[in-house]
Amino acid sequence: MTSVEKVSILGAETIHVGYGIQDHIVQEVISHLASSTYVIVTDTNMARTTPFTKLRNKFESKLKELRPESRLLFYSVSPGENNKNRETKAAVEDFLLQQGCTRDTVILAVGGGVIGDMIGFVAATFMRGVRVVQVPTSLLAMVDSSVGGKTAIDTPLGKNFVGAFHQPEYVFADVSFLETLPTRQFINGMAEVVKTAAIWNEEEFTRLEKFSKKFLAVVSAKTPDLISIKEELVKTVLESIRVKAFVVSSDEKETGLRNLLNFGHTIGHAIEAVLTPQALHGECVSIGMIKEAELARYLGVLSPVAVARLSKCLVAYGLPVSIDEKDFLKKVGNKRHNVEIDILLKKMAIDKKNDGSKIRCVILEAIGKCYQLKAHQVSKQDLSFVLTDEVLVHPFDDKLIPKTNVVIPPGSKSISNRALVLAALGTGTVRIKNLLHSDDTKHMLEAVASLKGASISTEDNGETIVVTGNGGKLVSCDEQLYLGNAGTASRFLTSVAPLVGINPQSGEHVVLTGNARMQERPIGPLVDALRANGSEIDYLNKEGSLPLKVKAGKGLNGGRIELAATISSQYVSSILMCAPYANEPVTLSLVGGKPISQLYINMTIAMMKTFGIVVTKSETEEHTYHIPRGSYVNPKEYVIESDASSATYPLAFAALTGTSCTIPNIGSSSLQGDARFAVDVLRPMGCEVVQTATSTTVTGPSVGNLKPLPHVDMEPMTDAFLTASVVAAVAKNGTQSTSITGIANQRVKECNRIAAMVSELAKFGVVANELPDGIEIHGISPNDLVTPSTEKRGIKTFDDHRVAMSFSLLAGLCKDKVLIQERSCTGKTWPGWWDILHTKFKVAIDGYELPLQHEDSTALVEKHGNGKRSIIVIGMRGAGKSTLSKWMASFLGFKLVDLDDVLEEKIGTDIRSFVQQQGWEEFRKQEAIVAKESFIKFSEGCVLSTGGGIVEGEEARESLKSYVKSGGIVLHLHRDLDETVVLLSADTTRPAYVDEIKQVWLRRENWYRECSNYHFYSAHCSSDAEFKHLRNSFTTYIKTITGFHVAQIPKKRSFYTSLTFSDLTEVASSLEDISTGSDAIELRVDLLKETTHTFVADQTAILRKSTNLPIIYTIRTESQGGKFPDNKFEELEELLALGIKLGVQYLDLQLDLPNDLLERILESKKFTKIIASYVDVSGSLRWDNVEWKNRYNQGVSLGADLVKLVGRANSFQDNLSLEVFRGTSTLKPLIAYNVGEKGKLSRVLNPRLTPVTHAKIPAESGNEGALDVAQINKAYTDIGGLSEKHFWIVGNPVGHSRSPNLHNAGYKKLNLPYVFDRFETSDAGEAFQKLIKEDKNFGGLAVTMPLKVDIMKYTDKLSDSAQVIGAVNTVIELEGEQGKYLGENTDWVGISESFVRDGIPNLENVNVNGLVVGGGGTSRAAVYALHQLGCKKIYMLNRTVSKIQEIQKNFPAEYNIEILDSVEAVEAAQPISLIVSCIPADKPIDEQLLNKLERVLYVGGEAKIGGFTPSLLEASYKPRVTPIMKIASEKYEWNVIPGVEMLVNQGITQFQLHTGFVAPYDVVHDAVVNQ
C-alpha cells in the first residue's frame, strides 16, 4: 500500500499527500462523502493523461461496488488561465443543472490552479454551496491554491477579484500527477515552495538549496523520471503544505497572519496582471519575491546575504529573478513595454490584501522569518525605486545627512574570488566569512560546483560559506560555464580549466563564456602563456577574448612560463594560484615592462601562503617568481576583508559633504592597494584622515574647499581612480587641474572607464581630458555644477558598477535631481550600495522610468535585431551570391568579404589551379579552416560570401551550424536551377564540376537547408526594371530578417488578397491588379501543386517580383478546410519553419496543432508576425459558445500577434453574434468573420486584414461568400460605415491639375463614396472657411501654389516633414480630434518614392551625394527627400544664389547642404549620383546654370557612385520629356525619371492619408498619364 502523509488544517486531517494514491483517493471519497452524484471536472489536457484515466477507471469500478445507486459525471473545460472566467464558470453550472445535480452533489476538481480555483467557486455558489474535493495536479496547485479554501475567477480588471472562501472536504496531493506536467509548469510551482520556506522555515530552505540541481535535472529531462526523486519530491510538497495549513488554521479569512503567504505577491501579482498569460504565476511571484526582498534590504531590515541567497535559490530552480532576463523576455515579448511603474502601482493599489488603497507588503527579516509577522504599509516612492533600473538621486540635504557614520562595505571581490579558487584546489574544509555575495562570486561558485571542484554549503543563515575542497581533482562538465561580465572569475578559471580532468560521462572540453561585454574584454596574454605551457585553448568567437574552449586533462607542464603583465595583474594571479598543480615547479617571469597593480600580485602570494604554498621572489631576475609543486591545505576559517575599492565611496561621500565616515575593518595592514586611497588621495585634497592598522576614518573639509591634486600616480589602486575623479570634479584652486596617471588598464575593464569619466563629467559641466595613461580633470566649484539633462537620459553607467557608484556621489551635489542609468550594475560588487546611500546617508532616491515613446517597438528591434553581427551567405555557384552580397553589404554599411579571396590569399594560388594540383579533398579541408577562422576574425560588420561547396565538408557544416546556434544569420541564396545551369556552363573561370550541376544540387540541398536559418530565392530577371525590382525586394527581405524593419499590424480598415492558385507562374503578370486595394497578400501553400521547399520558395520569389505587399504565409490542413494532410506534422513543421526562413511578414499558425509544435514555431519566429488561426469547418459553433473564447484566449496565451477565427453563418443573426464577441475580445488584434452566403456582413464589418478575392482568383471550396475590396466598400457605405466625403485641390491655377483624375480614379476602383474637385483661389482663408469650416462632408485638401505656406496657419499640428520643409501640401482632420487639422507634406515622398520605384537602393550606409537644381518651394521638398534617402551631402544649384542660401539657412546642419555658386565650387564638389530638377521646364535654361549642371552630369556619370546608374528626376510633368531630361539621358547617359512619376507617387501617399486605403497604383497612374 502506498504511504499517505496526512496534514491537519482547521482541526481536521483532510490534506493527504503521497505518490500514486489514486486508490486511496477513491476509497476516501466514496466511503466518507455519501452522494447521489459525483462530478469530476478537469480540463481537456488533463483528461488525456494516464494518471487521470487511472483515477477515472478506479472511481467508476469502486462506485459500482460501494454505491451502485450513485452516478458519476465528467465535464472538461478548455485549459489555461484565460478560461478562468465568468463564461466558463457559467458553462459548468449549466451542465450541472442540465444533469439534475442537487445539494448533495460532490464535485472533484482535478487539475491545476485554474481548475481548483474556478471549480471551487462553482461548488461555493452552486445550490448555495456543495461539497468539493480538490485533487491538484500541478505543483503550484498542490502547495498553494488547493490549500486554504480560497476560490475565485478572474475578471478583465484583475486576477481572483470575484470569489469566496469555501473549504474543501479533502485535498489529495498525489505527486504522481506531476508526471504529466510540462517542465515550465513544474518549475513554475517551485516559486511557491521556495516562498513558503523563505517566510517560515530556514531548515527547509537549506534543504531546497541542496535539492535544486537534482530536481532541475530530472524535470528538464525529455522523459522525467520522478520515481528517482520521489521521496524528496513528496517531502517538498508536504513541508510546503504544512506551513500553509498551519497559517490558514491560525487565520482562515486572511485578517493577519495569513497575509505572510503573500510574500512576493504584492509586486508579483501586479506584474502577472500585465504579463498574463505569457508569464506564469510562479515566474511573476519569483520576480516579486526578489523585488520585495530588495525592498526589505533597502529599508535596512534584510541583509544583502539573504537577498543573494534567495536569488540564487530561485535561479537554481530555473525561475526568473528579473523581468529583463533573456529567457523571460522571450516569453513575454513586446508585452515587456506594458510593465510601467504607474500601471504596476495601480494594480498593487487594488490588491485584495491592502488596507483601502494603502499598499501593503510582506517584509522579510531573514531567511525563514518575516518582520513582525504581518504585512506592512510601504510607500510608492520606495516601491518605485525597487521596480526600476534607473534612479534619480536628489540633492544631498545638510539637515538630514549624519555628521558621523560607520559603514562596513561588502567583502572584497578580489579576495573573495581568490579564496574560492584556493579553497576549491585545496583539501579539507574551510569556513569563509564575509564573502562578497555578488554576480561575480555567484558565477565563480557555480563554476566551481559545476566542475566538482568542491562541495559548497552555507551556515549562519548564509553568512558563512563552507567549502570542502577536492584537492584539485576537478572534472569536465557538459554545460558551458557562463560568467556574465565577471572579469576576475574568467581570468582565474582560464588557468584552472587545463587542470580539469575528463569526466567520462561528459565532454573533453571546458567552455568559458560570458555576456557581450565579457566577449570584448582581453584575455590574450594569459591564453598565450598557457598555450606555450602545453594547454590546448581555442577562441570560439573573437581572437583574444571569451568564449574559450579548453581541452581538459592536459594539465600544466610547469617549468618556465613567461607572461605579459602590463594589462592585468589578474593574469599573474591566475597562473600563480594554479602553478602548484603543474607537472614541474614553475618559474613565472613577467615580461614586457613593469607589471600593473603589483599590490594585487602581492595579495595573491600572501593568500597562497595562508593556504599552505610559499612563493619566493627571484633574487636574480626582476619580476620573476618561483612556485613549488604542492597542494593547498584549507585553513579552518578564512575571513574576507571588506572591499577597499568599495570603501572609497563612503569615504568620498564624507570628503564631498564635509562629514565624517569610518570604515572599521580596512586599515594600513590591508592586503588591498585601494586601502591607501584615503591617505594618498583624500588627505592631500584637504581631508582629515585617521588610519590605524585595521580602520580608516575620513573627515571632509566644508563643502567647496577640496583642493586639486596636481599629480597622483594611482597605479597601486587603479579601480579607485573613478572615485578620485568625482572628488577632483569639485576640487578647485585657481586654474590648477588634477592629473591621475598609472591607470591605462582601466580602458579595458567593464568599459573604457577613462573615456566614460570624460564623457559623463562633461554632463556636469566639468572639463576632463584623456592622458596617455590617465585623466586630467579641471575642477569647478560645487555651486557651478550643471544638472545633467533627464530628458537626454542623464548619466550613462556603461553597465559598470564603479561608474554608477562614483556618479551617485557627484549627483547629490547638483541643485536638482540627477538620473543615473542601470543602477543594478552595482550588484557586481555592492548590491546594497543604494540602500546604504538611502538608509545610512539619508539621501532621497526615486525610481525613474523612461517615457514610453523612447521604448517603442524599434527599441526592441535594436535590442534583439542582428545589429552589427556579420552575415554569412551560402548557396550554389551561380546563385547570385556575389551580386546579392554586394547589395546587402551596401545597404547595411558592411564590408564584403569573399571567402574564396581569403582562401586564395592563404594558399598562394587561384582555386582552379589548387584543385588541379591538390584535389578537391584537400581544397575542402583548407576551405573549412579558412571558414572557421574567418567567422571569428570577421565576426562584426561584414557580409561573408562563401564558396558554393562549403557545405560539402562536415567540419565547415559544423562551423555554419554553430554560427546559427549562436544567434548569427546564415543566409542561403538560390535561384532557378535551369538558369544556374545556363550560367555555369558558360563560365570557364572556375574549376569544373565533377558531377552534373543538378546532381550536385540534389546532394547539397539538405545540407544548405540544415546549415542556414534564412533563405532567399531569386526570381529570374529578364530586364533592367526587373533587376532593379529584385534589388528593392531583396533589401526589404534583409530589413525583415535583421529586424531593421518589422511589419506593422494595420490599425485601420485593411484587406489581404488570398491567392488560391496552384502555381503563381501563370498569373504573375496579373498579381498587381489582383491585389489592388489590399494591404497584404496571402500565399496558400497547401493549395500549391507541390510543396517541395524549392517550389514554395519559387512562389514567394514570384510574389516579391510582382508586388511589394507583405506576404501572409498560410498552410491550412484538411481538418481546417485546407488541403494539407492532417497527420503529417513533421512535414508541416518544416514548411512552417521555411516560411520564417523566407522572411515572410506574417505566418498563419493553426491553433489545433500540437502544443509543442506551436511553441517551437513561436520560439523561432524572429521578426515574422504570427496569426493564430482556427476555422470551425463544421459550422456547428455559434459565436456565444465558450469554445470561441477559449480559442481566442489560446491565441493570446501563445503570444501570437493576431488571432484569426473563422465561423460559418447559418443565419443572419450569426453575424451580429460575432460582433458581440468581437466587442469583448480586445487583448489582441482579431480577424473574425463567417463564411457562407449569409456571412457576407461579417466580412464587411471585420475591421482589420479582411480576406478579399478577385474575379481572376478561382473560388475555394468552403469559402463561400468571399467579396472583393470594391464590394466590401460598397456594402460598408450602404450600411453607413463609410460616409460621403469631399476633397479638393486648392490653389491658383488648378484648372489643369491632374490630382482630380488621380484621386477620383482611385475612389471609383475601390468603390469609395468620395469626390475630389478643384477649388481655385489665392486666399488660404477663403479655402479654410468655405471648404473646411462650412462643408460638413470635408475630407481633406491637396494644396498647391501659392497656398503651401499660407495654409499652415489654419492647421493645429504640423508633421515633421511639413515643419522642416516649411510648406504644407495636404490637410486632413486630426484623428480623434474633431475640428482640428493636420498639415502634412507629401511632395518629398513623391520625390523619394520616384527614385525608389525606379530602383534606387537604400543609401543610408552608402556615400552618395545629391543635387537640387532650383530654389522654389519644390526645392525644399527635394532637399528633405534626398536627406531621407540617405544622401551624405546635398548640393544646391540655382540662377539666383540668394534663394538657395535662404534654404540652406533654414535646414538643420546635419543635412550638409553646400551651394554650387561658381564653376570652382562645381569642380571641387564630390561626384553626384542623384539630381532633382525643380526649375520651370517651359522656359529657356540659364546658360551659366546649364554649364555648371553639365559638369555635374559628366563627373557623376563617369564615377557611378552607389552601384547604380546615376538618376535625374524632373519635377515638372509637362512636357513629358524636358530639355534637362534630354541632355542628361542622351548626352551623359543618366537614367531619367519623368515628373509625372513624382506627381503619381505624392498623390498615392496623399490618397492614403485622405482615405486610409492603399491606392490602386496602376489605375491612378493610368489616370494621370493617359487620360
Curated annotation (Swiss-Prot):
Active site: 254, 269, 825, 1204
Annotated PANTHER family: AROM/DEHYDROQUINATE SYNTHASE (PTHR21090), PENTAFUNCTIONAL AROM POLYPEPTIDE (PTHR21090:SF5)
Chain positions recorded as NAD(+) binding sites: 43-45, 81-84, 112-114, 117, 137-138, 159, 177-180, 188
One Gene Ontology biological process: aromatic amino acid family biosynthetic process
Organism: Scheffersomyces stipitis (strain ATCC 58785 / CBS 6054 / NBRC 10063 / NRRL Y-11545) (Yeast)
UniProt protein name: Pentafunctional AROM polypeptide
Keywords: Amino-acid biosynthesis, Aromatic amino acid biosynthesis, ATP-binding, Cytoplasm, Kinase, Lyase, Metal-binding, Multifunctional enzyme, NADP, Nucleotide-binding, Oxidoreductase, Transferase, Zinc
Pathway: Metabolic intermediate biosynthesis; chorismate biosynthesis; chorismate from D-erythrose 4-phosphate and phosphoenolpyruvate: step 2/7; Metabolic intermediate biosynthesis; chorismate biosynthesis; chorismate from D-erythrose 4-phosphate and phosphoenolpyruvate: step 3/7; Metabolic intermediate biosynthesis; chorismate biosynthesis; chorismate from D-erythrose 4-phosphate and phosphoenolpyruvate: step 4/7; Metabolic intermediate biosynthesis; chorismate biosynthesis; chorismate from D-erythrose 4-phosphate and phosphoenolpyruvate: step 5/7
